[in-house]
Regions:
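Conserved beta-strand/loop scaffold segments within soluble protein domains that form the structured core
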Residues: 1-240, 244-247, 261, 268-287
Length: 287
């Protein structure tokens, strides 16, 4: 707490449904100033809210260090959608921890766009404590130049019949490298829990690197869980097929990349934010 430098406290009372998204903008324009915001969201029973934030720093700001924390507490029957886009400059280092705790029949949705130009690490974790609680996490990131990134998404099941789904998509170009981790943990007693995860890395350069690491830790017998992971170059057969339909190679590759990222981009709850994310993807890919 001693390192807090602002943030957001969002409290949603019991049975309150907030239709319009709550938006926040975090702008860093001083490399010497502490940049450690803390986001705290509490959604009481049967409430609902959508929260969206943007993290931005100017190109002339210098070597910004961001160390942020987001905590989300979702009470019984409540629902929280949390969308976040990070776009810090090339000299910035971004470290972000996100945590959610869901009670009985509660739901949390994570929608994360990691569009930083500098190195970053993020850890997004949901503790499904309540029976019938749900977590859905979708993360995309695009790496360029010699950027280094580490993206971890977790779901820990305590509640019976709890459900988690994690999808991470990463596109790497130039000499960028990514480590993508997905961790599903089902504790003893979480009978009939279900945990699914998918991590995929698409590389646009022979010098780009990507590791996809799915991990299932199961301490209960009566559960279902699955994972899928892939790392590879743009499919040449797909490019050839699209070019045979009249597209240029650049247009074909762009279409494949958008299709690769679409499961996350299409889930952004605000149209303008979705459009902003598409612009940032295009800018980072140099298209």
């Amino acid at each position: 707490a001693a390192l807090w430098s602002g943030g957001v406290f969002l409290y949603v009372p019991k049975n309150v449904i907030i239709e319009d998204p709550i938006q926040a903008l975090f702008l860093s324009d001083d490399a010497e100033a502490l940049f450690a915001p803390h986001i705290l969201i509490v959604a009481e029973e049967n409430s609902s809210v959508t929260y969206v934030d943007n993290y931005v720093s100017g190109q002339d700001t210098g070597a910004v260090m961001h160390n942020g924390i987001a905590e989300v507490f979702v009470k019984r029957g409540a629902s929280v959608r949390f969308a976040s886009i990070h776009h810090l400059n090339e000299q910035a280092t971004d470290i972000t921890f996100r945590r959610a705790v869901t009670e009985q029949d509660a739901r949390v949705e994570w929608m994360i766009g990691e569009m930083n130009l500098g190195d970053f690490a993020s850890d997004t974790n949901t503790l499904l404590k309540g029976d019938g609680s749900t977590s859905d996490a979708k993360v995309i990131c695009v790496g360029t130049n010699k950027q280094r990134m580490n993206v971890t998404t977790r779901a820990t099941h305590f509640g019976k019949s709890s459900d988690s789904n994690m999808i991470t998509r990463a596109v790497m170009r130039d000499e960028a490298s990514a480590i993508i981790n997905g961790i599903t943990k089902i504790e003893r007693g979480a009978t009939h829990a279900n945990g699914e995860q998918t991590e995929r890395v698409l590389m646009l350069s022979p010098k780009a690197r990507g590791d996809a690491n799915p991990l299932l830790l199961i301490d209960e017998d009566e559960v279902t869980a699955g994972h899928a992971a892939s790392v590879g170059q743009v499919n040449k057969d797909q490019v050839y097929y699209l070019m045979s339909r009249g597209l240029t190679q650049e247009q074909a590759e762009r279409l494949i990349i958008y299709g690769f990222l679409a499961p996350v981009v299409s889930m952004i709850p605000i149209k303008k934010v979705e459009e902003q994310l598409k612009i940032l993807v295009e800018r980072k890919l140099g298209q």
